[in-house]
């Protein structure tokens, strides 16, 4: 799930640690204990303590989101949905709750549910709104919806505010849909590559794979070779080069690559 835990924890602490009543102290104690257990990777104990805090304050949106997030981590999507929906009952247009719920619904191919919650996003120019319409278009095999959503995303740099790897993987999955899809996706990838490639290996692999799928072989080769030259951890990039040379039937480069890999191993 795409959610910045560090930010969530800071916000959660600022909201939850308030007041001085005994009930508030107990709630804060259970919440902090839950955080500590989560950091130790004891998710079950963390959930138990969050639930104790929840029994004291059932209308805390941050706490409801934390419980839902933990249920996702534990693989219980049904309960996670319930808690995200409880958060939206308390605060109907909470973007964080909507973002996380819609991500969960998309993973489960729940189109009807997505159609219900997407209109609750207030900012129709936001990345969250356009992302979920794009994903709905994928699930519905609606080429027009996919194109329109990607045009809006590519025309606005809001998608760069937070790295969303699942989004870039989704882009690769629609690479061959249409010329416009390729055009808008390429614009998005170029911006993401410029911003993230120096610190994030995965965007290099995903972008290169996209370029291979659309037969931009030389461009894919360039970014893979640049990564390989500058990084020792590069076996995945060599594997993508092999895929590239195989797809374009470049026997000479494929043979040279095999020699390099034999020496490397």
What residues fall within each predicted segment?
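Residue-level recognition of tetratricopeptide repeat
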Residues: 60, 94, 126-129, 160, ...
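Structural marker of alpha-solenoid helical repeat scaffolds
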Residues: 56, 90, 123-124, 156, ...
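Canonical tetratricopeptide repeat
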Residues: 32, 66, 100, 132-135, ...
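N-terminal leader/linker segments that initiate helical-solenoid repeat arrays
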Residues: 11, 17-66
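Register position in tetratricopeptide repeats
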Residues: 39-40, 73-74, 104-108, 139-142, ...
